[in-house]
């Protein structure tokens, strides 16, 4: 984390948050770990540019990242470890790999992983070692003539002037990127994990190297399943407000259901309503079938829209509280899986509302009806509906 996140960074967080929510919806207890790399070349470069410490840079942007995720209704991870807090674990794992013959220290203290010693290297990315070998430049050209083999990758690197470092048996330095994830995964999830997730750009070499390190150290398979999200591509098409409008339709439907539930004079559902409640179970089935199909959120959202249309048509003023409550419960459960927020936030205070109403009244008295209408529209945009009565202006949140 060396800068503010953009939509491409947020995408995997949202995708895997949805996967997590669905698993929890299905009754699984999910231990969700999302780590932060808080020391690497990009963070150090940013720190030098700003004249501050790497820790200050990473702390600032981790805080901003968490805030942005909260604003997007992404649930906090069960654990969110930071690499710099797990250095000793990295040193221990590297030493284990050296002891087992899978890693070796060079003369300057750099520690490398012996790729060819792990016979299954390339099994995730389906890359062939011979093809990889032919694609590498010579040791002399690459400037890494300490390596036994061009394919070997760094586990520990020596410190450079002005960089953060930690003491180790090999040299003062810092860990390589790949070892960080193996160590934090083992500490918080165990030697063998159920699902490992990330962007498709991480399949090789990062995830491939994680597998090599972890399996050579622990002697068991690293992950049972892998989930990789594709890149987000944005072309020249005009970006519309359709997504926002779609969410507004859902939140409006939820608000109406709450009103029906509260205002209903009849509590228990009629026989016809009970039949319609059975029909609503069909939307749940459609939703689950979509999510079971490789987390097909597009079809899952379509099922939610069908439910909204059904609710708007069938939950009326005379509907029972039971029918309205059940419909709202179904809608809320499905929307929660997708991370959609059904509660409209009260982003305007009562005092502000009263002040604007007073200003509107003054405008009407001055026959400035344009301003009066403008204020009514402003309040409506914020979810406040005005009603002029003989007793004065009444307002309510909608």
Residue ranges and their predicted role:
Residues 1-2, 13-17, 88-258:
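Alpha-helical recognition segments enriched in aromatics with Gly/Pro capping
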Residues 18, 56, 60-67, 249, ...:
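A non-catalytic, amphipathic alpha-helix used as a structural packing/dimerization or gating element
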Residues 28, 102, 384:
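Short phosphate-binding/catalytic loops that engage adenosine nucleotides
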Residues 62-75, 221-222:
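A glycine-rich helix N-cap at a beta->alpha junction
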Residues 70-81, 100-110:
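Short secondary-structure capping/junction motifs at helix and strand boundaries
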């Amino acid at each position: 984390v060396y800068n503010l996140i953009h939509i491409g960074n947020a995408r995997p967080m949202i995708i895997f948050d949805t996967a997590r929510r669905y698993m929890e919806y299905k009754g699984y207890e999910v231990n969700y770990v999302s780590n932060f790399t808080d020391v690497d070349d990009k963070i150090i470069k940013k720190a030098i540019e700003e004249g501050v410490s790497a820790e200050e840079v990473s702390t600032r942007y981790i805080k901003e990242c968490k805030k942005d995720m909260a604003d997007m209704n992404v649930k906090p991870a069960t654990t969110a470890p930071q690499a710099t807090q797990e250095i000793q674990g990295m040193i221990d794992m590297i030493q284990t790999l050296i002891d087992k013959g899978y890693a070796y220290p060079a003369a300057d203290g750099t520690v490398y992983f012996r790729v060819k010693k792990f016979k299954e290297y390339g099994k995730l990315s389906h890359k062939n070692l011979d093809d990889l070998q032919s694609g590498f430049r010579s040791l002399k050209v690459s400037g890494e003539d300490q390596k036994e083999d061009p394919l070997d990758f760094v586990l520990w690197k020596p410190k450079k002037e002005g960089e953060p470092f930690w003491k180790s048996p090999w040299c003062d330095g810092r860990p390589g990127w790949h070892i960080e994830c193996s160590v934090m995964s083992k500490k918080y999830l165990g030697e063998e994990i159920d699902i490992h997730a990330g962007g498709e750009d991480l399949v090789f070499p990062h995830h491939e190297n994680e597998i090599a390190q972890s399996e050579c150290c622990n002697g068991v398979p690293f992950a049972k399943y892998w989930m990789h999200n594709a890149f987000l591509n944005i072309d020249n098409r005009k970006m519309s407000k359709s997504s926002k409008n779609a969410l507004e339709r859902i939140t409006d439907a939820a608000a109406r259901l709450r009103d029906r539930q509260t205002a209903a004079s009849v509590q228990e559902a009629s026989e016809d309503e009970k039949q319609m409640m059975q029909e609503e179970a069909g939307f749940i089935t459609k939703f689950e079938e979509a999510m079971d199909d490789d987390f097909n959120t597009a079809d899952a959202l379509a099922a939610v829209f069908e439910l909204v249309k059904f609710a708007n048509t069938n939950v009326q003023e005379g509907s029972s509280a039971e029918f309205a409550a059940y419909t709202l419960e179904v809608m809320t459960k499905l929307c929660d899986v997708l991370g959609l927020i059904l509660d409209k936030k009260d982003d305007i205070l009562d005092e502000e509302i009263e002040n604007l109403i007073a200003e509107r009244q003054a405008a009407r008295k001055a026959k400035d009806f344009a301003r009066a209408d403008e204020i009514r529209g402003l309040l409506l945009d914020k979810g406040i509906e005005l009603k002029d009565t003989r007793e004065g202006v009444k307002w309510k949140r909608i």
